[in-house]
A protein has these predicted regions:
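Peripheral, non-AAA+ core regions of ATP-driven protein-machinery
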Residues: 1-161
Length: 161
């Protein structure tokens, strides 16, 4: 996923780990005031019919010391969790930037106009990213950069196999 600090774009790596244990969802690298993302993502995934893992689920957002905007990382969080179970119909997520929020009903709202999507996508392209997933409502703002596939989604179901 990507975000900006003072207008400078940078990428955030999202990694998901599912291990045996009691059901629990931990998010590392998110500020304490942004912890509500866990409940929103879990509710959204369950609403669209995804069975939440009955084990310990850990989301790691790197670098942990960089600030993250919850409105830009919730969709990436949901995609990571769904991908660990093989329910995502998009191959090679390692070369993909995922931007956006997710509502409790699974819909993907537009990214705020204060985010310079063109700069974020250009920075991602310069880092070798080949695909960007973002809200369908933001496709026009994203443009059509050379060498980057842009995928717009309206709902988490758009990503399921």
């Amino acid at each position: 996923m990507g975000t900006t600090i003072a207008g400078n774009p940078y990428l955030i790596q999202a990694a998901e780990y599912i291990t045996p244990g009691l059901p629990y969802f931990a998010a590392i690298g998110i500020d304490d005031e942004d912890r509500h993302i866990r409940e929103r993502v879990q509710t959204a995934c369950e609403t669209v019919g995804y069975a939440w893992p009955e084990c310990r689920t850990t989301l790691l957002l790197l670098p942990t010391n960089q600030p993250k905007r919850p409105g830009l990382c919730a969709l990436a969080t949901a995609v990571c969790i769904m991908a660990t179970a093989g329910t995502i119909g998009i191959p090679d997520l390692e070369n993909t930037v995922i931007l956006g929020d997710v509502e409790a009903d699974g819909t993907i709202p537009p990214i705020g106009e204060d985010v310079d999507l063109t700069a974020l996508i250009e920075h991602a392209r310069e880092q070798g990213i080949q695909r960007v997933i973002l809200p369908a409502a933001d496709l026009a703002q994203a443009g059509r950069p050379d060498g980057v596939e842009i995928i717009g989604v309206e709902n988490l179901n758009d990503l399921k196999r």
